[in-house]
Amino acid sequence: MVMLDVLSNALMSVKNAESRGDRQVIIWPSSKLIGNVLRVMQRYGYVGEFEYVYDGRGGKYVVQLLGRINDIGAIKPRFHVKVDELQKWEEKYLPARQVGILILTTSKGVVSHLEARENRVGGILVAYVY
């Protein structure tokens, strides 16, 4: 099977495990971007602890699920967003005000849309979670 987008594959693995009611999911293959996205999701309480396990084939993440994710997905194509345009993208991808987060890659690292607005930085949209 050809993996074209490892982030999208990882987020779909989390979504499928959540819908089955699993308490943990193994994400393979892994990347630094996946680790940073998981860190943002952990900061907002969507996933529990996670750890990187190196297995000699690129590594994998073992993620503890909390059952708090209703929907999650990668945003494709990856849109470049200015800080003033974040409201428009919130309305497009999130179900209501103050519900969920958009995840962006910025010059300050991988952050949520709330942190990007606070730091006044734009970036590239990569995912949404609520």
Swiss-Prot record:
One of its GO terms (cellular component) is ribosome. Keywords: Ribonucleoprotein, Ribosomal protein, RNA-binding, rRNA-binding. GO terms for molecular function: rRNA binding; structural constituent of ribosome. It comes from the Archaea. GO terms for biological process: translation. Gene3D superfamilies: 3.30.1370.30, 3.30.1490.10. InterPro entries: Ribosomal_uS8, Ribosomal_uS8_CS, Ribosomal_uS8_sf. Belongs to the universal ribosomal protein uS8 family. Part of the 30S ribosomal subunit. One of the primary rRNA binding proteins, it binds directly to 16S rRNA central domain where it helps coordinate assembly of the platform of the 30S subunit. This is Small ribosomal subunit protein uS8. It comes from Caldivirga maquilingensis (strain ATCC 700844 / DSM 13496 / JCM 10307 / IC-167). The gene is rps8.
